[in-house]
Amino acid sequence: PARRIAEHALTDAARALRAPLRFVETNARDAAGVLDAALPAALAPRVDASRAAAGSPRTTPPEPRDVAIAVARAPVDADALGIARGRLTVLGLGPGRADLMTPAARAALADATDIVGYATYVNMAGPLRADQRLHVSDNREELQRARHAFELAARGRRVAVVSSGDPGVFAMAAAVLEALDGADDARWAAVELDVVPGVSAALATAAEAGAPLGHDFCLISLSDNLKPWAIIEKRIDHAAAADFALAFYNPVSRARPVQFDRALDIVRRHRAPETVVVLGRDIGRPGATLATTTLAALSAQQVDMRTMVIVGSSTTRRVARDGARDWVYTPRWYR
């Protein structure tokens, strides 16, 4: 019965048995009644012991049975019976390159009936099957996107919500959980929810450069769309004073042409001019570029919204081998 749709034990058992699990709206309290509601007798006649006994003279009603079995005359499509328990998977596509997408994310995409996300990221998720439904929306409609995903999953769909990078880093996992937290809907609560990690832009850029995040570091978004700029300034000041390596997301946009230089002014109060800086643009995508510079030479003209900026700590250093490219790393020791 549908009232038991949220029971994890049923989902686990179905997976272990590799059998479809379907639920049906019914008030029946025994297995035979549920079977009657799910599968018309014309398709699968059955004989139930408790009901057969009910037709014979007796003074007490038959006891309900926990199991009932129907044997159909022909194969029955399980997808046509009742509803499935919906599943919502929030997954990270990684920075963009196909070989940097995790196997778990790829499996979740392959299993999904519906793909939900910002149009650019839905395109990144491809190639997709013709039978998969695509639900694309604007990049700023995160909560609406999350609610739509829950509505689809509540109807028994297998929904993949896609983000670039890691879904838990300035991406859709928080929006999905916020939507669930603010909802009073038993159907949403019954949805099977999963979050699949991905390679974040900061980690992809760091790996391309070497190991600039090899010691303590923090990630800060410079976008003030969802938080006041004063909060951002305070966090930059404390993180820079504590000598964290800093990875800046969303450094510059047309609507925010000056905040990045203001952020650098704060960092420069705590870091030496020769502090190593890594600039990674579109890492993991076609046309990717990587550059190293110093805090003194860095300016807003060198970056855009697609640039990951990593400002090293006081111990971050550059090393070159045989005149080749520089590698950047932050030592694990601290002295």
Where does each model-flagged region fall?
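Internal, active-site/partner-interface "lid" segment
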Residues: A32-L35, R51-R65, A211-F260
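Short glycine-rich anion-binding loops that position phosphate/pyrophosphate groups of nucleotides
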Residues: P57-R58, P62-D66, A72-D77, P95-A98, ...
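General beta-strand structural signal in soluble alpha/beta enzymes
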Residues: R22-E25, A54-G55, T60, V71, ...
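Class I SAM-dependent methyltransferase SAM-binding "motif I" and its flanking Rossmann-like core
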Residues: V169-A245
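Short beta-strand segments
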Residues: P61, A70-A72, L91-G92, V161-S164, ...
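C-terminal edge-of-domain segments
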Residues: P40-D77, V303-D322
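Class I S-adenosyl-L-methionine
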Residues: A2-G33, L39, V76-D79, I83-A98, ...
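A contiguous loop/helix-start segment that scaffolds small-molecule binding in enzyme catalytic cores
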Residues: A28-R29, L88-V90, R158-V159, A241-R335
